[in-house]
Amino acid sequence: MPMAELYDLFQRGMQLLEAGDFNAATVPLAKARDLDPEKASIREALGRAYFRSAQFEAARAEFEALVERAPTNDYALFCLGRSLLELGRPKDARKALALAAGLRPDRRDYRIYRDRARAAA
């Protein structure tokens, strides 16, 4: 795997993500993910870009892949739950959001979305 290419793709994707060009960010980040699908930082950034560009099914897939590899990643669980909520799947979202809130009880936003999923389910 060409490491320089992977790094350049990731950096370009992050620049676009930070600039708020979420849809454009998915292009280099997806290419980077294809080069190194095990790299959590790439999958997280790609999931964020998909979520922010309202591509919720694609975001769900990225965050689900992260949770499969790291079941105690509170941020990935939170984002998975948020994606599932956006897809109209509050029952599925409840578990991920409850786990995220349990792992990080200090995160008020996690508790708010957990409670929303419970109420909607």
PLM regions: where:
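TPR-adjacent "capping" and linker segments in tetratricopeptide-repeat scaffold/adaptor proteins
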Residues: 1-8
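Structural signature of tandem alpha-helical TPR/SEL1-like repeats
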Residues: 19-31, 53-65, 87-99, 121
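Mid-chain, well-packed structural core segment of small domains
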Residues: 61-86
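TPR/TPR-like (Sel1-like) alpha-helical repeat modules
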Residues: 82-109, 115
